[in-house]
Amino acid sequence: MASKKVQKIRDKRKARVRAKISGSTERPRLSVFRSSKHIYVQAVADNEGKTIAHSSTISDDVKSKITDVKKVEAAKEVGRSISRKLRDMGIQEVVFDRGSYLYHGRVKALADGAREEGLKF
């Protein structure tokens, strides 16, 4: 786990980011969670309080494609997966919620993968 100082900085950053963005049914919030081994993403409609779609490195559709790849490449595939799911539902635009994480590394790779599949931020 991160040190108390780092966690406090992350909490402040998360509050600052979340205060500025909100998702709707037409344009959901794409929320990212990153652990040491996996990355998770979900599309949330804040006006309804529901998760519309989700994907992660432990999802069956992604897990089969990411054997023997680095974490950044796995994150990119998760981004492609969530983009395909949302496109099938007729959603073209989202609001990207990086949470408390810097837009760098796996978080950036996830966003790039989603953009490659045609999702607009």
UniProtKB/Swiss-Prot annotation:
Keywords: Ribonucleoprotein, Ribosomal protein, RNA-binding, rRNA-binding. One of its GO terms (biological process) is translation. GO terms for cellular component: cytosolic large ribosomal subunit. Signal peptide: none annotated. This is one of the proteins that bind and probably mediate the attachment of the 5S RNA into the large ribosomal subunit, where it forms part of the central protuberance. Belongs to the universal ribosomal protein uL18 family. This is Large ribosomal subunit protein uL18. It comes from Syntrophus aciditrophicus (strain SB). The gene is rplR.
